[in-house]
């Protein structure tokens, strides 16, 4: 554990250990992954956070790191509120660590998870060329495995997972189809597969083409599922993904949909995509055109950036410049830099599902510098790609 979580002592002042904005709030808890060694690529063992998600009961954070580990952190809220001399380092509250054998594509909390019910302490994880696994982080055991098999009889990973609100099914996205696995029976094969594109979809139905990249269930109708694809298309399905597709549209910017978020009233859908500086807003009651775009997102990256709603008609999102921004309707009303002196991508901003005044913020990357190789002849000198360490943190903010 000491090797996994190293305090970045010489950069504490840069890593936001005090109030940075009276509007957004302040850091009350933090886990820093950081080192200050110097090494030459391509060997890159240094660790940093990729993303994080609150559990449905708001008690635990599940985070993904560069070493392909999923870590469950039980957030000590009572200790956070008592800490007055800076944010509490809650790295000792690691309750479970799962090491994936391959690159993690996606993960999702069990929708009925409650910390005081050990049988419900589950999350699903999908990795490259591996079955989808259902893990109980209390017992540390693999409760079940679910198989997505391609035409060559090989396991496939899913880029998006979503439990239905009743906890009965796990939905997994695939290319031109999505699969439903029954959690209660534990059957390894999908009990239903919905084809979204191809000859099995009649010409009079909407067709959703591409590798499915993200899901989002409507908060006002738990059976309405929004599906995004890496082909820049979004589809709306009733009954948790059954055909026919009710609506389908193409986003105007970006290089593949990476995140979908419904507004509180379930009428507008926020769409984030790769390599796009704008978050698009669509009204599903009238999808002929995009309603408006949230300008200044700073999302020009292939990295998946997870954003969230905050209060009515407000959205919080990180960017590649190390800042978190708040929009009210389509107006940018607040901007807070959270990564110190470094322009790092803030990959996750998520409100606690029980108390929206508490936010989870996640960022991290390697820090690079370039030096000339003096051993080469002067006319053939080359620049060495060196990384000097990592700057990364998983933080809990309070308004």
Curated annotation (Swiss-Prot):
WD repeats by residue range: 44-83, 105-145, 150-194, 207-247, 252-292, 296-337
Keyword Cytoplasm annotated: yes
Molecular function in Gene Ontology: RNA folding chaperone
Gene3D superfamilies: YVTN repeat-like/Quinoprotein amine dehydrogenase (2.130.10.10)
One of the protein's GO biological processes: telomere maintenance via telomerase
Keywords: Cytoplasm, Repeat, WD repeat
Name assigned to this protein: Guanine nucleotide-binding protein negative regulator 1
Source organism: Schizosaccharomyces pombe (strain 972 / ATCC 24843)
Gene that specifies this protein: gnr1
């Amino acid at each position: 554990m000491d090797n996994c979580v190293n305090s970045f002592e010489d950069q504490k002042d840069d890593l936001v250990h005090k109030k940075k904005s009276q509007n957004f709030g302040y850091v009350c808890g933090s886990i820093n992954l950081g080192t200050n060694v110097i090494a030459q690529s391509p060997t890159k063992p240094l660790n940093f956070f990729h993303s994080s998600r609150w559990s449905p009961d708001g008690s635990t954070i599940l985070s993904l790191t560069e070493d392909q580990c999923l870590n469950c952190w039980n957030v000590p809220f009572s200790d956070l509120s008592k800490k007055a001399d800076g944010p509490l380092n809650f790295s000792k509250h690691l309750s479970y660590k799962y090491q994936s054998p391959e690159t993690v594509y996606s993960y999702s909390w069990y929708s009925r998870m409650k910390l005081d019910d050990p049988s419900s302490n589950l999350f699903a994880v999908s990795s490259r060329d591996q079955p989808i696994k259902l893990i109980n982080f209390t017992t540390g055991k693999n409760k079940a495995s679910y198989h997505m098999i391609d035409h060559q009889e090989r396991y496939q990973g899913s880029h998006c997972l979503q439990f239905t609100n009743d906890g009965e099914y796990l939905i997994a996205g695939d290319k031109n189809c999505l699969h439903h696995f029954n959690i209660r029976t534990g059957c390894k094969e999908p009990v239903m597969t919905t084809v979204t594109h191809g000859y099995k979809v009649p010409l009079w139905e909407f067709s959703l083409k591409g590798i499915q990249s993200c899901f989002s269930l409507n908060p006002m109708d738990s059976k309405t599922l929004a599906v995004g694809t890496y082909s820049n298309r979004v589809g709306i399905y009733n009954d948790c993904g059954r055909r026919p597709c009710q609506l389908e549209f193409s986003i105007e910017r970006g290089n593949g949909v990476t995140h979908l978020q419904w507004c509180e009233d379930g009428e507008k859908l926020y769409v984030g995509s790769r390599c796009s500086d704008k978050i698009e807003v669509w009204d599903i009651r009238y999808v002929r055109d995009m309603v408006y775009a949230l300008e200044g997102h700073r999302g020009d990256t292939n990295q998946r950036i997870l954003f969230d709603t905050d209060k009515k008609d407000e959205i919080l999102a990180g960017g590649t410049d190390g800042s978190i921004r708040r929009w009210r309707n389509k107006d940018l009303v607040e901007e807070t830099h959270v990564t110190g002196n470094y322009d790092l991508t803030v990959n996750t901003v998520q409100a606690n599902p029980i108390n929206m005044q508490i936010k989870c913020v996640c960022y991290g990357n390697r820090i690079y510098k370039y030096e000339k190789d003096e051993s080469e002849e002067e006319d053939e000198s080359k620049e060495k790609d060196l990384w000097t360490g990592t700057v990364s943190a998983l933080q809990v903010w309070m308004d």
